[in-house]
C-alpha cells in the first residue's frame, strides 16, 4: 500500500469489529448492518438517507457504483422495511446510459416528455387519494419523479471530462490497472460535492479478495487496483474540505 500508506492519519481503524461467520456473503451483510440469521434489515446507507433526509432533490441520497451481477451484491443497498425510496440507486459510468432505464427515448422532445410526466403525476394523485395507505405506490411515484429529475443531474455528476489532468492522475485514471476504480471514486467525490449522502463504490463484482491460494500474488494484484485510487480519493476529499 505505498500510496494509501501516506493517508493513514486521515483514516479511522475500527479494531473492535469481528464476525461470527466465515461465509463471504454473511460478512458482506454484517459489514452493511445485519447478521445473515437476523430478520432482513435496512443497510447503513438506507438508514443514513432515512435519518438525515435529502440534500439535493435532483439526486438520490444513496448511490451504488460498481458491478452487481451477483445477487448477493444487491443485498448491500436494499432498504427493506424502510421502503424502496431509501434503497441505493445503481448508477453506471457510461455517459450514454448512466441510469439504467432512465434515459429519455430518442426522438422525444424534452417538452413532450415533461408533459407526459405531468399527466402521469395527475393520475398518480388520483390513485393516492383512492389508496392513501399504499406505501409502495407512494414510493413508486417518488422514484419516477426522481428518475425524471435525474435525467439531467446524473449525467452531469458522473461526467469527469472537466476534471484536470492532475486530478485524473491523482486517482490513477491514466493507468489501465487503476482506471476503473479511479473513475468510480472520482464519481463518488462528485456525488458527495452535489449532496449525495452515501455512496458505495465497489472495485469489482463479488469475490475480488476471495483468494484460496497464491495469496501474495493475488492479493498484491487486488491491492494494486485500489491503492492509488483510494489514496487519491482521500487526498482530493481532504483538500476540498470534504473530510471535515
Where are the regions that the model predicts?
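Ligand-binding pockets and gating/stacking loops
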Residues: 1-244
Amino acid at each position: 500500500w505505498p500510496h494509501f500508506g501516506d493517508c493513514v492519519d486521515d483514516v479511522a481503524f475500527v479494531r473492535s469489529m469481528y464476525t461470527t461467520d466465515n461465509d463471504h456473503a454473511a460478512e458482506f451483510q454484517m459489514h452493511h448492518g445485519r447478521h445473515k440469521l437476523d430478520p432482513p434489515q435496512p443497510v447503513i446507507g438506507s438508514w443514513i438517507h432515512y435519518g438525515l433526509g435529502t440534500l439535493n432533490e435532483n439526486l438520490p441520497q444513496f448511490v451504488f457504483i460498481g458491478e452487481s451481477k451477483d445477487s448477493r451484491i444487491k443485498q448491500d443497498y436494499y432498504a427493506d422495511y424502510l421502503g424502496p425510496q431509501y434503497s441505493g440507486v445503481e448508477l453506471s459510468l457510461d455517459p450514454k446510459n448512466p441510469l439504467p432505464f432512465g434515459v429519455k427515448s430518442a426522438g422525444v422532445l424534452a417538452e413532450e416528455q415533461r408533459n407526459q410526466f405531468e399527466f402521469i403525476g395527475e393520475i398518480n394523485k388520483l390513485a393516492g387519494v383512492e389508496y392513501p395507505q399504499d406505501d409502495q405506490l407512494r414510493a413508486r411515484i417518488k422514484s419516477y419523479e426522481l428518475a425524471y429529475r435525474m435525467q439531467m443531474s446524473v449525467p452531469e455528476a458522473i461526467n469527469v471530462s472537466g476534471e484536470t489532468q492532475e486530478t485524473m492522475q491523482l486517482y490513477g485514471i491514466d493507468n489501465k490497472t487503476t482506471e476503473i476504480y479511479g473513475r468510480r471514486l472520482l464519481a463518488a467525490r462528485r456525488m458527495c460535492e452535489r449532496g449525495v449522502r452515501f455512496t458505495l463504490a465497489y472495485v469489482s463484482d463479488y469475490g475480488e479478495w476471495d483468494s484460496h491460494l497464491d495469496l501474495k500474488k493475488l492479493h498484491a494484484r487486488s491491492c494494486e487496483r485500489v491503492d492509488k485510487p483510494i489514496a487519491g480519493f482521500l487526498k482530493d476529499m481532504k483538500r476540498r474540505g470534504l473530510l471535515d
